[in-house]
Amino acid sequence: MERRYLKNPFPDFAGGENTPFASDEEHIKNLICTYVDAILEHCHPNSDDEDNRGDLYVGNAGIAFMFWKLNSCEQTRDLYPALDHAASFIRNAKVNANRYKKRSAERYSFLCGNAGIYAVSAAISQALKETEELSDDLANFKSGIPCSKEFMHTKYGCDEVLVGRAGYLSGCYWLNDVLPEKKITDDDLVSICQLIVTSGREYSKQNNSPCPLMYQYHGTEYLGAAHGLCAILHMLLDSPWFRTLPISAPAAELRDIKRSIDFFLELQDSDGNFPVALEDLRSGRDKRLVHWCHGAPGAVYVLAKAYLIFKEEKYLASLRRCADMVWKKGFLRKGPGICHGVAGNGYVFLLLFRLTNEMRYLYRAHKFMELLTNAEFKLRARTPDRPHSLYEGVAGTVCYLVDLLEPEQAYFPFMDVFH
């Protein structure tokens, strides 16, 4: 395991919880400019060299989202003509999206499909006040609603975040947050959630799972955020069922969702981490990754949402164990990105800071930023396959740095537990 991460070179926070923490905003802005300049140098929106798909995960839509975020932050809005760049990158992504329009699954595939492209385009069109383009973007995005309601079990799975229904829900929630009027109705959101619950129940029953709701992706019962249980449960908790008190979820749905969260919670090990997949427990294979996609850095979002809804201290205690483990083992050699890199792990501390207002977590978040320019990290870190992309590369790192400038509003892309 030690090969996967660098030893943390920083002392932990030594001040009291009310000790003010001074942020070096100019250093953060300079680092943002370093990464954005590299993106503009190496990524050209009208070229297919960098990406042939255009999606949010590693394509032009992800870079467009980064520029949209730069424009959304008062402190970074004037660093670049961000909306112009966002429009250029999303335009190319939509050209690529046209090739896949006839595939129904593409219409609700968010991080790795057409739905994410049109969602980001809608936000950009809104910012540019392009009403006709916004209308077209929303129509294309909402074409995923009927497709996502088709009940199906495939050998690949269709409920997770990257390409499935949970990811589509995350896009619906995000659009409803960033657009001035709610565009996706509660009825549509609830019907998708109901189908996800039904799917999880049926799979669990068919496979004698110990968890009331269980899902698979390519035959593996993943537990992490990218393909697995914890992010699916998070998106169910974000639904209208849990938006107000008293909770409006039907009793059976509430029972199965809560029991599934508590089942997942019990899988946390003494270090504070979680298994990659349920099969690891059955086989005795001890594979523990410290990534957003697999492990505690992605699990924190469902735990935080559960804490906010159910007010049970066990969820906060679990979150603190996650954060302490990430502080020890989260300086990954896999690069600076948010899926399986330093910035994604740094987001754990921004989440805990928003949740607790404790300065130790903001301090830790800043130390993860400092690691990006650490000599050992620059020497030993690997270069991702898509080094400038949103999830694997520095476009996601830029989003993390922007959030360091406004930590009270920080959120991992499309996973805001406070919305």
UniProtKB/Swiss-Prot annotation:
- Pfam families the UniProt entry points to: LANC_like
Identify one Gene Ontology CC term for this UniProt entry.
plasma membrane
**Superkingdom of origin organism:** Eukaryota
Question: What is one GO biological process annotated to this record?
Answer: carbohydrate metabolic process
Q: Which family is annotated?
A: Belongs to the LanC-like protein family.
Per its record, how is this protein called by name?
LanC-like protein 3 homolog
